[in-house]
Structure formats: C-alpha cells, structure tokens
Amino acid sequence: MIGTPYTEGARRAMLLGCGELGKEVAIELQRLGVEVIGVDRYPNAPAMQIAHRSHVINMLDAKALRAVIELEKPHLVIPEIEAIATQTLVEMEAEGLNVVPTARATKLTMDREGIRRLAAETLGLPTSPYFFCDTETEFNQAISKIGVPCVVKPVMSSSGKGQSVIRNVAQSAKAWQYAQEGGRAGGGRVIVEGFIPFDYEITLLTISAVNGIHFCAPIGHRQEDGDYRESWQPQAMSADVLAKSQAIASKVVEALGGYGLFGVELFVKGSDVYFSEVSPRPHDTGLVTLISQDLSEFALHVRAILGLPIPNIHQHGPSASAVVLVEGKSKNIRYQGLAAALAAENTQLRLFAKPEIDGRRRLGVALARDKDIDSAVNKALDSAAKVQVIF
C-alpha cells in the first residue's frame, strides 16, 4: 500500500546520496506517490531540489546518520553512494529498518575488498588476479607479484577517483600517492589488480524483483581516467557470451540478496567473461536507458524495491549517452547552446543542476537514438559538445 505524501499514511523513502542518479530515482519514486527525503553532505544537491524535504549531514558519521533516520522514520532507506557509515545501516536493519537492497549488500559493495572476496573466493567467479595492500611496502610487493601493467584503486572510491594504470614500475610511487588521495573515506587500503587485455567491458543491469531475476540489454561503455565518457546499448556480443555474463550476474545478485537493480560490471575477452565490480543501485553508464528503454534503470529499481513486478523490458534500438564534462570553478553555473544540442531528432538532454563546480565535474548527459550504435554515439557526442557551460 502507498499513501499520499505529507499524510499519516505516506510511504517514506530516504535517499542517502542526492546526485544525478539519486535525482532520477526520486522522480520515479514520486511518480508512484512516495514521499522522498534527500540526504547528502552538501546543500542543494540535485535530488534535494525535487525531494519533499532534505538534510545535510556527513553520512560517514554514524551518530549523524542514525539521528536523521530516527528523526524521519523512513519505510525505505536507499543508499545511492558508497561513502556511508554502512555498519550503522547493518545495526539498524537488525532493529527493523528496511535498507535497499539489504544492509549487507550495501556494506559489501561499499569497498572493493568485500565484493571481490565474495565474487572470487566465495562464489568462485573468474576475476583478474589481485592483492589488497595497507602499506606502500605491501603495494610494491603486490606489483612485483602481479607484474605490469596492473591497475591500482582505493578500496573505497567511485567515479575513477584514485584509480590508475601502472605500465612500468617507475610509476608505482605516484600511483600509490594518487590512490591515497582519491579514496572516499581518506587514504588507506588499496587493491592491485592484474590488467585484463579485454576486448570490451559491459554493464549488465540486473534486476532482482518479486517475480524473479531480469536483465536489461548489455551496455557497452568507454572509460577515461576511471570514469565513463560514453555508453551505448545494446553492446554487440554472442549469445554464448551473453549467457555467461547473465549467469555471473545472477550469482552475484542472488548472493547479495534483496530487491532492486544492480549494475554488474564485466570484462569480455574472446569467449571469456570476468567479473569486475557491482553496484547495488543504478549505474552511471545506465543513464543511456533514459532513452533506450521503455522503463529506465531508475524506474526498474523503484518498481523492484517497492515489491512490484517487472514486465518485459522493451529496448527501443541503438542508443547512446555522452557526458557533459566541464572543468572550472563557479557557484553560478549557466548553460547555453541547448537549442543546437537538441536540434537533431531522437536526442534528449539531462542537465543535473549541480550547485557548483570546483575542478572537473559531470554536469549533464546527452542521449541519442539512431540507426546503429556508431551513429547513436556520434549523435550523442555532437549533442553534448554543443552544450556551452558559462561560469
């Protein structure tokens, strides 16, 4: 049962993280009559702008997190980022709090160690070789064992922060320092992974719902500096490789438990599929589904977490997304060139309405459909390039 916002019978959902992905989740929640409470570390975050009300706290502060949850008494807590005091969610779930998809899934996936050990050591899924390191000495030993090239990431980071590829050992010291600076919770433990010379990488959006496991068409994407630049759907792949990908994704999602949409990242090399990472929430590469599917990843996530069934997911055809990435410093961001950006048919634009920029930041995404993937990607890139950001 869903009541009406601001009434005694309202169904209340609390978003922990109010960025562009959380904003789309909030929109879908409101379409189904759910009262939305936004929580983030800074004011006027994108989802806060449309939430029924919001709070600014340090979500890594266990006391502050518990206090805001006890104040609002949400029926659902929906983590949208990694930087959260997840042990508090585990404790409060044991007290009766409903965490999406589960507090365990949120805790395991907030850092790369929990999910990598689950995938490789518990589930026996194929992954790259890896070591976890607490000190620079352990870090250098791991590099000597794995060899170069190898990939270095903080165990807790997102959007490529702190990630680098070591192509020769002379880059080791710089990579260690960069990883220490890039972690969401400060410096600390890192993972060193063997580099898989993959043919392509995909995100397989996997939904666990009341009526079973469902998959979106595979999404291909291009990464730069550890962050996505373009994504497209569907990624061309053989039926055999797709079946292997779905089998891996199913195992991971079922092991994590709960209802919701999961972004499962996989590497494909020939006919081999390797598990990379998973997010128990909508994925940034999945922004393409805003134009590629009848139900976006956000709509699917909300249906699943509300205990509603997932029907057949209709994919409209070759589609792509391209980010609007800007570097600068401003608290008065403005946009022009929108008419040109939207002049071509089957194009859309999402401006995230982030309140400020200090450095490099993703401020929007262009979306496009066309006759084939290359045409769709080029159309999305052209649209994104025409957006002019004024400081």
Swiss-Prot record:
Binding-site positions, N(1)-(5-phospho-beta-D-ribosyl)glycinamide: 20-21, 80, 284, 354, 361-362
Nucleotide-binding found in the keyword field: yes
Catalytic activities: N(1)-(5-phospho-beta-D-ribosyl)glycinamide + formate + ATP = N(2)-formyl-N(1)-(5-phospho-beta-D-ribosyl)glycinamide + ADP + phosphate + H(+)
Gene Ontology terms: cellular component: cytosol
Domain ATP-grasp: 117-306
Disulfide bond positions: none
GO biological process: 'de novo' IMP biosynthetic process
Entries under Pfam families matching the protein: ATP-grasp, PurT_C, RS_preATP-grasp-like
Keywords assigned: ATP-binding, Ligase, Magnesium, Metal-binding, Nucleotide-binding, Purine biosynthesis
Binding site for Mg(2+): 265, 277
Signal peptide: none
Pathway: Purine metabolism; IMP biosynthesis via de novo pathway; N(2)-formyl-N(1)-(5-phospho-D-ribosyl)glycinamide from N(1)-(5-phospho-D-ribosyl)glycinamide (formate route): step 1/1
GO molecular function: ATP binding; magnesium ion binding; phosphoribosylglycinamide formyltransferase 2 activity; phosphoribosylglycinamide formyltransferase activity
SUPFAM superfamilies per record: Glutathione synthetase ATP-binding domain-like (SSF56059), PreATP-grasp domain (SSF52440), Rudiment single hybrid motif (SSF51246)
Residues holding ATP: 112, 153, 158-163, 193-196, 201
EC number(s) given by UniProt: 6.3.1.21
Oligomeric form and interacting partners: Homodimer.
Family the UniProt entry places it in: Belongs to the PurK/PurT family.
Matches recorded under HAMAP family: PurT
Role according to the record: Involved in the de novo purine biosynthesis. Catalyzes the transfer of formate to 5-phospho-ribosyl-glycinamide (GAR), producing 5-phospho-ribosyl-N-formylglycinamide (FGAR). Formate is provided by PurU via hydrolysis of 10-formyl-tetrahydrofolate.
Protein name: Formate-dependent phosphoribosylglycinamide formyltransferase
Chain's gene name: purT
